[in-house]
């Protein structure tokens, strides 16, 4: 998404699915972490939450972070505190979480265009974080540092609970002989979720 907004991608690190990454970002070199950090003006850290603190501090210990460099992570549960080792070396910490379920395919670009992003950053650079969210295609929503855990809990509830309930429902339908339980429930679940989202978006009635 950022490439489409005019950003030049200087490199990506090797991950769990290099083939898929190459398909989505053709021609972008795969480099080691230190080399990506050395070349980039904006570093995006999209790693599991448990790995983020060690990654940030490890790069700091190797002297990788640069003054004025933008460092953005996409973890829903953490704000900018986890980026303190980078900030102490002059980097600008940003936390931007696009509220979509990533597939690792071009479908993600379409989802981003209709999505929102939770944004946390120091007040002086909050407009930068908001602008990057917009360039991804998202509408930015500011989340306070102290509220990131509650935000992550809300996101986890919406995604994991939905998967669990649908899994239970499809299993019961399959047990009674429904051959395509996912297809059977598709329209019902989508319309129910859309109705619930509309109800949640409506302003409360005046008393």
Predicted regions located by residue number:
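NAD(P)+-binding Rossmann beta1-loop-alpha1 motif at the extreme N-terminus of oxidoreductases
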Residues: 1-38
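Rossmann-like NAD(P)(H) cofactor-binding subdomain of soluble oxidoreductases
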Residues: 23-25, 29-107
């Amino acid at each position: 998404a950022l490439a489409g907004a005019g950003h030049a991608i200087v490199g990506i690190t090797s991950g769990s699915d290099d083939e898929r990454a190459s398909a989505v970002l053709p021609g972008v070199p795969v480099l080691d972490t230190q080399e990506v950090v050395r070349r980039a003006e904006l570093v995006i850290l999209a790693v599991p939450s448990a790995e983020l603190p060690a990654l940030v501090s490890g790069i700091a210990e190797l002297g990788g972070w640069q003054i004025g460099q933008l460092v953005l992570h996409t973890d829903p549960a953490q704000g900018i505190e986890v980026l303190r080792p980078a900030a102490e070396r002059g980097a600008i910490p940003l936390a931007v979480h696009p509220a979509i379920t990533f597939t690792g395919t071009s479908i993600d670009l379409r989802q981003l265009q209709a999505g929102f992003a939770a944004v946390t950053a120091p007040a002086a650079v909050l407009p930068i974080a908001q602008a990057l969210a917009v360039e991804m295609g998202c509408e930015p929503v500011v989340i306070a540092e102290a509220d990131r855990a509650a935000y992550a809990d809300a996101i986890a509830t919406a995604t994991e609970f939905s998967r669990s309930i649908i899994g239970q429902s499809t299993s019961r339908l399959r047990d009674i002989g429904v051959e395509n339980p996912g297809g059977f429930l598709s329209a019902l679940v989508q319309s129910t979720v859309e109705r619930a989202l509309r109800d949640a978006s409506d302003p409360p009635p005046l008393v």
